[in-house]
């Protein structure tokens, strides 16, 4: 999860987030190289004493600086389209969960189980225990199996919300009257925190998300006790 004064992105926990981190680093390197080249050319222009007052145009140069950026943008677009396809792909999910946004809490339903659902509210600051995180702890965590594909169905009952967990590379809008879907897969156990990422009213910042990823055997035991 995030820590104070963090500069980079959170550590990746899912294959999708790994791909997003690689794409981010790849694109950032291209931007850095282009920026360095532009700054170098500007510094040469400011320091040189050579001028070309007789030059009216330069067709070759204009052609190069039109075609080359287009090629770079196409390469970046191809990489991003691949990741977009991977994020939309649903491959034989082990479990399906329905998430509904409300002002200002989340409700969850395990659709593969009968009558397994609950609401998840933020724990007020005055009720936090030592070591718990302010504005991020909830009374009911979402328990999910690790290393398994989970399909999330996300919607809202009132206004626009957005269900986001950064370390898993997830951010899906919760829109009233529309059912969006996404998949998640955590490669290691642990607690993963997120928040509503769409301005949804006065208590928008009090809608945390907590996923607890556990081994499959533990999840089966927990679900049997809850049903």
Curated annotation (Swiss-Prot):
The keyword Nuclease does not apply. Pfam families: COX2 (PF00116), COX2_TM (PF02790). It is a multi-pass membrane protein. The modification Phosphotyrosine is found at residue 218. Residues 1-14, 88-227 are mitochondrial intermembrane. GO terms for cellular component: mitochondrial inner membrane; respiratory chain complex IV. PANTHER family: CYTOCHROME C OXIDASE SUBUNIT 2 (PTHR22888:SF9), CYTOCHROME C OXIDASE, SUBUNIT II (PTHR22888). Component of the cytochrome c oxidase (complex IV, CIV), a multisubunit enzyme composed of 14 subunits. The complex is composed of a catalytic core of 3 subunits MT-CO1, MT-CO2 and MT-CO3, encoded in the mitochondrial DNA, and 11 supernumerary subunits COX4I, COX5A, COX5B, COX6A, COX6B, COX6C, COX7A, COX7B, COX7C, COX8 and NDUFA4, which are encoded in the nuclear genome. Component of the cytochrome c oxidase, the last enzyme in the mitochondrial electron transport chain which drives oxidative phosphorylation. The respiratory chain contains 3 multisubunit complexes succinate dehydrogenase (complex II, CII), ubiquinol-cytochrome c oxidoreductase (cytochrome b-c1 complex, complex III, CIII) and cytochrome c oxidase (complex IV, CIV), that cooperate to transfer electrons derived from NADH and succinate to molecular oxygen, creating an electrochemical gradient over the inner membrane that drives transmembrane transport and the ATP synthase. This is Cytochrome c oxidase subunit 2. It comes from Nyctereutes procyonoides. The gene is MT-CO2.
